[in-house]
Amino acid sequence: MQEYLEKRYALALYEIAEKNNKVDEYLRDLTDICDIFDENKEFYEVINHPKINTAKKKQLFTDLFKGKIDEELLSFMMILIEKDRILQLREILDQMEKIDLERRNTIRGIVKTVVPLLDEELEQLKAIFEKKYEKNILFDTKIDKSLLGGVYVKVGNDIIDGTIKSKVEEMKELMLKKE
């Protein structure tokens, strides 16, 4: 039920942002606000405190964000405070990012390697998956020394694990089965 509400809030906000041609701005601002929640425990505790009334919480947000974020985004935050859903902001942001990717015909993928890939290598991977999915691919690249070598790629439900670590684990399982 809660995820359903988060999707509805995200869709409503996305449509406002899209109408105002401010989708990227809203996503950036929401990310920054969520980071404030994560990094500032005192702020989080004030927002989460049951004895601090809604009016004070709204005033705190107004003082902090008025003039720094779009008025309609601030109004949206006020609604979340009134509905006692402001702490679901990260989930609403996640849903809004999914909506944005969908509307842009884009999906996210993960590429893990021991050393950074060259731009050409990343473009080749991207081209392969864009052809398969018929969508734009946005890769998050991560360096993972535990892989020992090779490459790990995850896009949607597809996983390509060409890492040395996975090959060693497969060999270990085979050897244990023979015993």
Swiss-Prot record:
Its main location: membrane. It is a peripheral membrane protein. Pfam families: OSCP. One of its GO terms (molecular function) is proton-transporting ATP synthase activity, rotational mechanism. Keywords: ATP synthesis, Cell membrane, CF(1), Hydrogen ion transport, Ion transport, Membrane, Transport. It is found in: Cell membrane. InterPro entries: ATP_synth_OSCP/delta_N_sf, ATPase_OSCP/d_CS, ATPase_OSCP/dsu. One of its GO terms (cellular component) is plasma membrane. PROSITE patterns: ATPASE_DELTA (PS00389). F-type ATPases have 2 components, F(1) - the catalytic core - and F(0) - the membrane proton channel. F(1) has five subunits: alpha(3), beta(3), gamma(1), delta(1), epsilon(1). F(0) has three main subunits: a(1), b(2) and c(10-14). The alpha and beta chains form an alternating ring which encloses part of the gamma chain. F(1) is attached to F(0) by a central stalk formed by the gamma and epsilon chains, while a peripheral stalk is formed by the delta and b chains. F(1)F(0) ATP synthase produces ATP from ADP in the presence of a proton or sodium gradient. F-type ATPases consist of two structural domains, F(1) containing the extramembraneous catalytic core and F(0) containing the membrane proton channel, linked together by a central stalk and a peripheral stalk. During catalysis, ATP synthesis in the catalytic domain of F(1) is coupled via a rotary mechanism of the central stalk subunits to proton translocation. NCBIfam families: ATP_synt_delta (TIGR01145), PRK05758.2-4 (NF004403). Belongs to the ATPase delta chain family. PANTHER family: ATP SYNTHASE DELTA CHAIN. This is ATP synthase subunit delta. It comes from Clostridium beijerinckii (strain ATCC 51743 / NCIMB 8052) (Clostridium acetobutylicum).
